[in-house]
Amino acid sequence: MESYAVSRRTLLQWIGKTAGAAAMYQAMTSLGFAAETRHDEQFALSGAPKGASVLVLGAGLAGMTAAYELRRAGYKVKVLEYNAKAGGRCWSLRGGDRYTELGGATQECRFDEGNYLNPGPWRIPYHHHAVLAYCKRFGVKLEPFIQVNYNALVHSTEAFGGKPKRHREVQADFQGHVAELLGKAVNQGALDQSLTVEDREKLFESLRAWGALDHDGNYQKNMESSLRRGFAVDAGGGLMPLAEPSEPIDRHALLDSGLWKKLIDGQEYEYQSSIFQPVGGMDMIAKAFERETGEMIRYGSKVTRIDQNEQGVTVTYKNSDGSGEAMQDKADWCVCTLPLSILSQIPVNVSQSMQDAIRAVPYDSSVKIGLQFKRRFWEEDEHIYGGISYTNTPIEKISYPSTDYGKPGKAVLLGAYVWGPNAYEFTAMSPEQRVKKAVEYGALLHEQYPEEFDNGIAVGWHRVPWAQGCYGMWSEGSSEKHYRNLCQIDGRIVLAGEHASYIPAWMEGAIQSSLDAIKRLHTHAVATQRAA
């Protein structure tokens, strides 16, 4: 048999790619190797030039952050916002809300009181320090968001007759089978030239612990594996039956199914516990910012042109409903937080390099569908409390509510979170068709769907009038060429938003981008005044 040297680093990288971060960390710990966004909670600008004014375009989180901090510094601030309320993509839909998308389709949300859908952001990772800091400052109550639920489902129409498996079964069996194979490689001496005897023993023990292997290094039906994957019969009390171990999924069938690909989601940095959500809906954050900045905001204002010269900035706008004449506001400086998908359609007097950057970033497509059911059958029938189920069908995910467990009556779950080509296909449908498809696909995981379904609402982000896309989707090439040009101050204008951050699509990116932009703009404004 051919032998070859494998370094510790290569071995760990291979384990990580094959078995995931948890396995790699377990191995790193055994071999003695294993031993985040920045935000200044004391951030404050001061000493604004006397009488200096700033126009902020857009009252999403980036815009309201800029308005809040600039006013604290002493600037005169006015915000122009397209919608009748603030928040932008930080948005929740509740019963009674009406929403009209591009193309004219209007939906009225018919959810019961207390139920809601977050069409945009829905999670706050523990390391998104800026978002959490403003939540604390403004008194936004938070609660846990359940990302990983080991009793949730993993499903493929091409595996196991289309029947879903439990997350815990797939994870336990995948870890067990991989650990068994790696353990055999260790014991057969394949790594002897690269690992000491002590390393080999420690690595084998770590694989036994990680994969729930028996003393001989095998993964099989027994009490140890069932403590990971669940029992065929759970333990009881008194004269009830003893616990019975369950049968692991066949290794070849599991590998062929591809279900293991979904295990990585909860291990990615952005989705690791703890994760939070505002009590009552994500727009509680927007409403908190709005309480601090609302008097500066002119609602229902559609920006149509942005001009600048050496003296200041002039923004032309009209009422969003089309009524009235065009209006203009002037200021010394401008912080523009409009999505690039919108800004690229507006005449803007900036350098060619910034214009090129504005037009270089396409916006990803996404669709979210909220479904209200007559009862919480996922809890009552299947004991799924929060978390996410995954499927290879176009709906991709079903996310169960992380709050009000056991509450009687109707409840809403996220019935689809669609990306890529499927999102374009769903966006082309009518809202009613999107909801119908979500119910059809969801029924492949939960047979209760058709009988328990009550009503739904669907948001396709490329049809959202004020965004026309989900988020700025930088490529490596476009980022290298255009990112710095997009973020630099251009005369008297600076851009901010998730698209001007290294954390696109996240609220944290929007806020961090805004703080960086206004800090630089303030420094520039002060220097300009001194030089005058």
Q: What role is predicted for each listed range?
A:
Residues 114-125, 271-279, 354-362, 421-432, ...:
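Active-site rim elements
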Residues 151, 158-159, 182-302, 310-312, ...:
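Active-site/ligand-binding neighborhood in enzyme catalytic cores
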Residues 14-15, 20-23, 31, 35-41, ...:
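Conserved flavin/dinucleotide-binding core of flavoenzymes
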